Amino acid sequence: MKASMFLALAGLVLLFVVGYASESEEKEFPRELLSKIFAVDDFKGEERGCKGFGDSCTPEKNECCPNYACSSKHKWCKSI
C-alpha cells in the first residue's frame, strides 16, 4: 500500500515537471528571465546623486538618499 502510494505520488510529480518544462519552452522562459536580469543590472549601473541603504557614508555630510540617514556609529546609510 505504501509503495503504491509512493509510486503514484512520484508519477504525479514527474507529470508536473514534464508539463512545466514543455510549457516553459513554449514561452521562452529562459530568454525572458535573462533579459529581465540584464535589465536590472543596467538600472543598477546608473549613477545617482545619493547613497542607498548600506552604502558607506560620512556622518557630517548629507550623502544618503531621502528616507535614509548616515549612522554615526557604523558609518553607513540606514533607514530613518
From Swiss-Prot:
This is Mu-theraphotoxin-Hhn2q. It holds the Pfam family Toxin_12. Lethal neurotoxin. Selectively blocks tetrodotoxin-sensitive voltage-gated sodium channels (Nav). Does not affect tetrodotoxin-resistant voltage-gated sodium channels or calcium channels. Residues 1-21 form the signal peptide. Keywords: Amidation, Disulfide bond, Ion channel impairing toxin, Knottin, Neurotoxin, Presynaptic neurotoxin, Secreted, Signal, Toxin, Voltage-gated sodium channel impairing toxin. It comes from the Eukaryota. Expressed by the venom gland. The presence of a 'disulfide through disulfide knot' structurally defines this protein as a knottin. InterPro entries: Huwentoxin-1, Huwentoxin_CS1. The lineage of its organism: Eukaryota, Metazoa, Ecdysozoa, Arthropoda, Chelicerata. Residues 22-48 form a propeptide. One of its GO terms (cellular component) is extracellular region. Belongs to the neurotoxin 10 (Hwtx-1) family. 51 (Hntx-8) subfamily. It is found in: Secreted. Monomer. One of its GO terms (molecular function) is ion channel inhibitor activity. Disulfide bonds join 50-65, 57-70, 64-77.
